Amino acid sequence: MHHCKRYRSPEPDPYLSYRWKRRRSYSREHEGRLRYPSRREPPPRRSRSRSHDRLPYQRRYREHRDSDTYRCEDRSPSFGEDYYGSSRCHHRRRSREREPYRTRKHAHHCHKRRTRSCSSASSRSQQSSKRSSRSVEDDKEGHLVCRIGDWLQERYEIVGNLGEGTFGKVVECLDHARGKSQVALKIIRNVGKYREAARLEINVLKKIKEKDKENKFLCVLMSDWFNFHGHMCIAFELLGKNTFEFLKENNFQPYPLPHVRHMAYQLCHALRFLHENQLTHTDLKPENILFVNSEFETLYNEHKSCEEKSVKNTSIRVADFGSATFDHEHHTTIVATRHYRPPEVILELGWAQPCDVWSIGCILFEYYRGFTLFQTHENREHLVMMEKILGPIPSHMIHRTRKQKYFYKGGLVWDENSSDGRYVKENCKPLKSYMLQDTLEHVQLFDLMRRMLEFDPAQRITLAEALLHPFFAGLTPEERSFHTSRNPSR
């Protein structure tokens, strides 16, 4: 049974409320995104649009976003935002509200102009000096005002706009210090809280780069960073679309099973590397997984009597480390975007690396079916959906949680005759019921997902174990290799 589409109400910008409160790490509450492409009329009961806070950095950005974070229609992004995915907001699925916070400085000086300091040597050309002497202007919310043809640091020439979000904006640049290579440059708003959060993310990216000098572990790597008149700027290699963007533009036609298998293997490989280095991503979702190259071919699906896009190269990179948390850092209570949030986070039982494993299980289901497994925005409903799909929540987790308001005599308190109750009853079924074919490789995929979706994080499969799962036996030697020629460096 195909899930029907429900709209959700946005949640508060967690990037502001959580990560900002800690000195070394932060997390955001990313909420509900509408994944079902059929229904577009407003909901009869309540708004169900998700509030993420991320902005994809895409190379073919065409339309200006009108909201804060990454996607406009139903998904809303987060600070770390989908690094290279497109931010074509007017046709997106999430709605986001512009974060109202404004420093007193920006409230009184809406359009502040500063003279750009010229760091060039005396031998620099007159044209370069003219570029450097242009005034630096911020808009009333602290975004850098920049145009095509502007230069930053006399190194980065802006050649395109990739998107804009709560955190700032992303532009496509030519890096003249590296042979005019294309980069996505993330320009943070000139606001203290965002500047500090960017420094935290830079620290994580530095650690990843230090541990992965040969870039074998499929994480987007920072090639440069600098402070430009109060705007923290981070440069990344320009990649393709994120996996949600591709899914959306393909009318939510699921990825073929071989594609799911290869992407799953790469995800497990990348996240195992992070976990072995005492780092938890905490915000895994399709928007934060990017294709290296999202070129595709159009094929005709005789079974569905329609054309569909098939990506030519399923190599991916993991992005958005704005919420990544080291084991020794403070762990905020709430992490992960709603649809990929594990039960231990909802029940406030504490979390660690298994949090990422649950998120991967949800992502694989979405790749396989084209819609989210847990289409909700509210904790109680989320837990009920988990029980309908995965079975009862273990009693020891119920006894330990402080969220006793959700339970009575060891069971969830839930009105099945309410509109939400009817929705869950009609649209949620045991996990295996979603299997498209009863063949060995499909059975193996669902076995892997079920192990990733264990309620008890202590019983959840580790990523080292997942990489040995029989589902990956069908990979080719080429798909198992992770060679890359990328070598981003400052």
Curated annotation (Swiss-Prot):
Region (Disordered), start-end ranges: 22-138
CDD domains per the UniProt record, alphabetical: PKc_CLK3 (cd14214)
EC number(s) per entry: 2.7.12.1
Residues that hold ATP according to the record: 162-170, 186
Catalytic reaction(s) noted: L-seryl-[protein] + ATP = O-phospho-L-seryl-[protein] + ADP + H(+); L-threonyl-[protein] + ATP = O-phospho-L-threonyl-[protein] + ADP + H(+); L-tyrosyl-[protein] + ATP = O-phospho-L-tyrosyl-[protein] + ADP + H(+)
A GO term from the CC aspect: acrosomal vesicle
Modification sites for Phosphoserine: 9, 49, 51, 67, 76, 78, 135
Composition bias, Low complexity: 117-130
InterPro entries: CLK_kinases (IPR051175), Kinase-like_dom_sf (IPR011009), Prot_kinase_dom (IPR000719), Protein_kinase_ATP_BS (IPR017441), Ser/Thr_kinase_AS (IPR008271)
GO terms for biological process, alphabetical: regulation of RNA splicing
Swiss-Prot/TrEMBL keywords: ATP-binding, Cytoplasm, Cytoplasmic vesicle, Kinase, Nucleotide-binding, Nucleus, Phosphoprotein, Serine/threonine-protein kinase, Transferase, Tyrosine-protein kinase
Pfam (any one): Pkinase
Activity modulation notes: Leucettine L41 inhibits its kinase activity and affects the regulation of alternative splicing mediated by phosphorylation of SR proteins.
Biased composition (Basic residues): 103-116
Active site annotation, chain numbering: 283
Role noted for this protein: Dual specificity kinase acting on both serine/threonine and tyrosine-containing substrates. Phosphorylates serine- and arginine-rich (SR) proteins of the spliceosomal complex. May be a constituent of a network of regulatory mechanisms that enable SR proteins to control RNA splicing and can cause redistribution of SR proteins from speckles to a diffuse nucleoplasmic distribution. Phosphorylates SRSF1 and SRSF3. Regulates the alternative splicing of tissue factor (F3) pre-mRNA in endothelial cells.
Record family assignment: Belongs to the protein kinase superfamily. CMGC Ser/Thr protein kinase family. Lammer subfamily.
UniProt name for this protein: Dual specificity protein kinase CLK3
